[in-house]
Every structure is written in C-alpha cells, then in structure tokens.
C-alpha cells in the first residue's frame, strides 16, 4: 500500500532518525522530485517539528536554505516536507581520509563564514558550529554549503531594537566540547564571537585531521571536558596553526579579541582567506577534494563556467528574496529547548563551566578503492539523507534536534 503525505508526496524508506522523530525519503507524486519527509508523533511529550518549521520560515529567502514544501498533520503524525540535502562535511572528511587540501578548506571557510553571518543577521547565534552541522547540496547545488541544526540556537538580540543580551558568567557549557570557544569553557554567556571561534577550530580540524585536545582520557565526562578546556587554553594559537598559512592564526586571534557584544567584521575574515586563495593560485572551479576522489579529475571549463553563473544567479535571487523576509516573526523560544545539549563528537551534556602538514597541501591523498568504499557509508551525494547529522546516521540519539539550514553567498570571487 502506497503511503501518501498531503496527498502530494509518496513516503519512501527511512533514512534517518533523531530524538524528535524519523526522516524518510519521499517523492513528489506528480514530478518525481525527491524530498525529505520528517515525521513526529502528535502525542510526543516534547514536540519539536513546529518549532523547527518556525526557524525555516524565519530563515527562508537566503540562498540555499532548504525550501519547505509542505507542513501539516497526517493521521497520527506532524509532518514537514522539505528539500533533500547531501552529506555533511564530517561525512565528506571521512570520505577524504580525514584530511582536506588547503584549497578545499578555503572554499569551505568562505561559505561557512557567510552562513554564520546570515544566522547572526537574523538575531540568533548557533552555539553548535561543527562539521556535522554543515551539509552540501545535491545536483546543481552540490557545491553549496548549508548549515543545519538549530537545537541549541539562542536569540542574542532584540529583533526590533537590536538590544544585545546581557553579559553573564557561571553558565553551563552548551555545545560540543571539541569546538567550543575558550569563553564558553569559562562559563561566559555565548555571543557572535563564539560561533566564529568555533569555526576557526573546525577549519584547523580540517587542516590537521584532528585537534590537540582530542582523545584525552578521563574518569568522568566532566573531567574530560575540563581536560579539553585546559589543553585548549594551554595551546597557543601559533602552535595550533604551526605549518599552515598565517591567516588561520590571524583569524583565531581576531575572534578571541572580540568583546562580548561586538559585531564581528565578517567581510574582513572572508577577505583574509580570499586573499590567501588568490596568492596560492587556486582556481574558482568549485572542485572539492571529494569531487576529485569521486570523478578522478576536474570538470571541463564549460561545466565550471556554467556552475559559476548558476551560483551568481542564485546569489542575486537570494538577495532579492532575503530582503522580502526581514519582517518575518522571530524564531522559536529559547528556553529549555535551546538549552538542551546534544551528543556527538565529544558532546557536552550540561556540565558546569569552570601532525603538521606543509601549507602547500593542495590536492587530496589517494586512498584505496576498498578504503574509500568503506568510508563512504555516508552515501556520497546522490540519495544522501536530508538534514541528517552523522550522529543520526550512526544511531546516536540527539536531544532537542531542530535541524534547519541557511546559506548566503557561495565562494563569489567577484564580490566583496
């Protein structure tokens, strides 16, 4: 018997799950377009899907934001039908033998800064910036980076007056310890600067393959998080970034120098990496390391030029749509839902705060076919689950998962 949603979509196989419900592959009955269908039992104790849909409505209009196809109730379930997305950057990192080339890191950095800037422009901070929460698009949007999972997001300023939330201390650590900012470890209320500092650690994770505070042993989780904090604070930025272009240490030093309520200079940070990209002589061909491993060679110039034009057209359309959505209502409440913690790579459950490679690493390491197939359990691109983090795919339950995503400009070398 064929299961239908909204009398328009066919329900297919299950492709993921979280504590909030299950995610299925679906298809538009008329057009055959593949979609992601999220189901949540109407009797669930802590309904999340309605809150998630509010985030999407608030973020709609930005380039690359997954479009919401349909929302409503179907039988015993709350349902949200949305655009299907591809694998996460953590999945792709594993596919590439846990090392990205400098070119790929810089291409990603540019887009990731823009995603965070967009969230901040909508008056929210993400508070869980990590590779699992960035996904690639599919098809002609396969080179567009999306940001997902607003389960820990918090409103940091009033939408109308832009009054910033007050500075506070003795806060519980919220987020993922591996990428948490030093101020977060110290129990200081998070703000825009912390999302960007976390991104700096993500970029060095992509460069190095792992961070110095990974793999630390401790008797309890609390002690482990304290050891991570101590190691992070005792590792100078210059040591962390040794062997890599100075732009990475400049980025992190800039983020750590920001005051609590400062508005970061996103353009300056993007330009740091764009200038480095130019000096390295890299090409704006949108060929990431996983493309090389998948196809064995770069695409022809006609394909590259076509993709560049598509990106620029998406950008222009997104700017027009975005300007029409600024009056949308604010997102979900930021109480218990936003404060619940998630489990992933060194996840932090509400705890009290208290290999160098030359910079010329410009192409991915070859790996054997067997290794690659083993690592590709994440289903590279086609048919990959939509808006599902790596932890969903490995069966780990998440607390208060509210995936959402937004994007702004892909690596637009003609602007800014």
UniProtKB/Swiss-Prot annotation:
PTM field: Autophosphorylated. Partially dephosphorylated by PPP5C. May be dephosphorylated by PP1.
Stimuli inducing this protein: Down-regulated during granulocytic differentiation.
Residues found modified as Omega-N-methylarginine: 382
Listed transmembrane segments: none
List of residues that carry Phosphoserine: 343, 354, 363, 389, 405, 408
Tissue expression remark: Expressed in all tissues examined, including brain, heart, lung, liver, pancreas, kidney, placenta and skeletal muscle. Expressed in monocytes and lymphocytes but not in granulocytes.
InterPro entries assigned to the protein according to its UniProt record, in alphabetical order: CK1_Ser-Thr_kinase (IPR050235), Kinase-like_dom_sf (IPR011009), Prot_kinase_dom (IPR000719), Protein_kinase_ATP_BS (IPR017441), Ser/Thr_kinase_AS (IPR008271)
SMART domains membership: S_TKc
Top EC class of this enzyme: transferase
Substrates-to-products reaction catalysed: L-seryl-[protein] + ATP = O-phospho-L-seryl-[protein] + ADP + H(+); L-threonyl-[protein] + ATP = O-phospho-L-threonyl-[protein] + ADP + H(+)
Protein name: Casein kinase I isoform epsilon
């Amino acid at each position: 018997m064929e299961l239908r949603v909204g009398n328009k979509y066919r329900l297919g196989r299950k492709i993921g799950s979280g504590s909030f419900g299950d995610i299925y592959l679906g298809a538009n009955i008329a057009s055959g377009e593949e979609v992601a269908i999220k189901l949540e039992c109407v009797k669930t104790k802590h309904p999340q899907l309605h809150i998630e849909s509010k985030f999407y409505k608030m973020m709609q209009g930005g380039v690359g934001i997954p479009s919401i196809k349909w929302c409503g109730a179907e039988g015993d379930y709350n349902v949200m039908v949305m655009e299907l997305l591809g694998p996460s950057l953590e999945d792709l990192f594993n596919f590439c033998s846990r090392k990205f080339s400098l070119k790929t890191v810089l291409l990603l950095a540019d887009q990731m800064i823009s995603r965070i800037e967009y969230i901040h422009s909508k008056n929210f901070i993400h508070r869980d910036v990590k590779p699992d929460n960035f996904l690639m698009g599919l098809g002609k949007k396969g080179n567009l980076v999306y940001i997902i999972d607003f389960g820990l997001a918090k409103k940091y300023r009033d939408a109308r007056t832009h009054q910033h939330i007050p500075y506070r201390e003795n806060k519980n650590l919220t987020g993922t310890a591996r990428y948490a900012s030093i101020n977060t470890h110290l129990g200081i209320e998070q703000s825009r600067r912390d999302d960007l500092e976390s991104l700096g650690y993500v970029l060095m994770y992509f460069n190095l393959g792992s961070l110095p505070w990974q793999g630390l042993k401790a008797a309890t989780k609390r002690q482990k998080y304290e050891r991570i904090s101590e190691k992070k604070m005792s590792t100078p930025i210059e040591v962390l970034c040794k062997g890599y272009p100075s732009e990475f240490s400049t980025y992190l030093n800039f983020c750590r120098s920001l005051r609590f309520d400062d508005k970061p200079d996103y353009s300056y940070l993007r330009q740091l990496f764009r200038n480095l990209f130019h000096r390295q002589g890299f090409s704006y061909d949108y060929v990431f390391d996983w493309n090389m491993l998948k196809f064995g060679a770069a695409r022809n110039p006609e394909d590259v030029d076509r993709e560049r034009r598509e990106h620029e057209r998406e950008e222009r359309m997104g700017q027009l749509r975005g300007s029409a959505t600024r009056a949308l209502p604010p997102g979900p409440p930021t109480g218990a839902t936003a404060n619940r913690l998630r489990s992933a790579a060194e996840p932090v459950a509400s705890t009290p705060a208290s290999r160098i490679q030359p910079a010329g690493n410009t192409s991915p390491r070859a790996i054997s076919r067997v290794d690659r197939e083993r690592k590709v359990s994440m289903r590279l691109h086609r048919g990959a689950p939509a808006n599902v983090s790596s932890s969903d795919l490995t069966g780990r339950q998440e607390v208060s998962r509210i995936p959402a995503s937004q994007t702004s400009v892909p690596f637009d070398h003609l602007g800014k």
